[in-house]
Structure formats: structure tokens, C-alpha cells
Amino acid sequence: VWKTFFMKDGVWLALAFMLLYRLPEALSVKMLTPFLLDPPEAGGLGLSTAQSGLVYGTAGVIALTIGGILGGVYAARKGLRKSMWIMALSLALPCAVYLFLALVQPERMWIVYACVVLDQFGYGFGFTAYMLYMMKFAEGEFVTSHYAICTAFMALSMMIPGLFAGWM
């Protein structure tokens, strides 16, 4: 199974894609909780754990789900190849909302909610393309095993950058 996976056409390009596609999210997600909870004088937003849970764990999850569903609809209509750039940008660019939040330090919670919802919606929308790409790449004789290998690289793509996120 391993041999057939690494003999697939374009395997090294596919692995580079799998390892780099989620890089912005991999770097930002590890620092998100400290950013939300740290006091403003330390560069954070000073949210309580309840506020953080509500904004990220509730509003964010709802936006992520809606983004994923709409990403699937979009990719089904346009095709994965035609939609890849839009979906990749929708995953990467919303991470900039945290730069905005860090610079502005808003006191109004609705601004924080709107930014987190935008980020999570974009992540859900863009992540759909990533999943579809792995499904497409895994096609062939050992589709289930090859997809499992792809998901292992997906996990690795979040773990390795996460190790360095706090130093940046």
C-alpha cells in the first residue's frame, strides 16, 4: 500500500500541497486561545473563558459548518480545479482578521464575533477543497488506505507548524 501511494503520479507535488495548504491556519490556531484570553496590555483581547467559548466554540463552529457546506456546493458547481484558488484564498486570507483585532483591540464584542465568524466561514469553505483534493488523489486500487495516508499528512501539516507558532 505504501509503495503504491509513493508511486502515484505527482506524489511529491501532492505531498507539498497537503503539507502547505493549511499553513496559515496551522500557525494561527495555536495562538488563538492565548490571543483571545490574554489582557489587552499583553496584546490579547481580554475575553473571559465563557466569552471565548461562545465566540469560537459556538459562533465559530456554526460559521465553519456553513462554510463547509457552501464550499461543497461551490466545488460541485464549478469543479475542484476551477475553484481551487478561490477556496485556497478563502482559507488563508481570513487569518488576517486576527491582525486587525490585534491592531484595533475592539471593545465591542460584535466586532470580535464578526471577525471570528469570517475566519471560520472562510476556513470551512476552503477546507472543503482540501478534503476533495485528498479524495481525488487517493483514487485507485487502495483508495481507503491511500486516503488514510493523506489524512496522516493532513495531521502532520497542522502539527509541525504548530510547534513553531509561538516563536513567530
What does each model-found stretch correspond to?
Residues 1-13:
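Juxtamembrane intracellular "pre-TM" segments in multi-pass secondary transporters
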Residues 21, 30-52:
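Short amphipathic helix-loop junctions that connect adjacent transmembrane helices
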Residues 66-85:
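Helix-to-loop junctions at the C-terminal end of transmembrane segments
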Residues 49-50, 140-150:
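Loop-to-transmembrane helix entry/capping segments in MFS-fold secondary transporters
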Residues 19, 54-62, 89, 117, ...:
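Transmembrane alpha-helical cores of Major Facilitator Superfamily
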Residues 33, 71, 161-166:
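Small-residue (Gly/Pro/Ala) motifs that create kinks and tight helix-helix packing interfaces
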Residues 61-69, 158-159:
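Residue-level signature of mid-helix packing/kink "hotspots" within the transmembrane helices
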Residues 82-130:
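C-terminal transmembrane helical hairpin of 12-TM major facilitator-type secondary transporters
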